[in-house]
């Protein structure tokens, strides 16, 4: 499987939804592999999260896809309140998990997905596109509360 072609096919699908996208080469980044970035809307008010999709070979027949969404780039004065809610949100979160990246005080959602590579790049991109929207729905559900708790009301 061609990882670059896979990310390019996924980018086309995201662009059809009018998401701003960018392919980022893995140069001195903590991510494994190249990254597809997209600004994904999470509500009718126009709020968006920064979504990073990274994919790299996990085995001969599978690809590990990480969907990392920065929901709040820098948590405000409600850091402790937001931190306390993480346990409740993660207990009921159907896919992935919410967390706080302490170094940047960033609130995120992360989902790792093991993808069998027995299809072509276009088929695999369509499958990941579906998973991205599942993750987006999970994020959209708690986004207003996360923003309010963080102190960014």
Question: For the regions a protein language model found, what residue spans apply to each?
Answer:
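Short, internal acidic amphipathic alpha-helical interface segments
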Residues: 64-106
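A short acidic/glycine-rich loop-to-helix N-cap element
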Residues: 116-131
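Charge-rich, low-complexity N-terminal segments
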Residues: 1-52
């Amino acid at each position: 499987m061609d990882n670059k072609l896979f990310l390019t096919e996924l980018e086309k699908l995201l662009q059809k939804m009018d998401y701003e996208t960018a392919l980022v080469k893995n140069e001195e980044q903590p991510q494994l592999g190249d990254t597809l970035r997209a600004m994904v809307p999470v509500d009718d008010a126009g709020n968006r999260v920064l979504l990073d999709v990274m994919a790299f070979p996990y085995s001969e027949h599978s690809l590990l896809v990480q969907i990392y969404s920065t929901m709040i780039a820098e948590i405000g004065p409600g850091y402790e309140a937001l931190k306390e809610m993480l346990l409740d949100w993660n207990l009921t979160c159907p896919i992935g998990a919410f967390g706080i990246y302490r170094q940047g005080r960033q609130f995120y959602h992360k989902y790792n997905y093991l993808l069998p590579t027995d299809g072509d790049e276009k088929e695999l991109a369509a499958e990941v596109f579906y998973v991205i929207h599942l993750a987006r729905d999970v994020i959209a559900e708690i986004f207003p509360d996360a923003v309010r708790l963080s102190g960014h009301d």
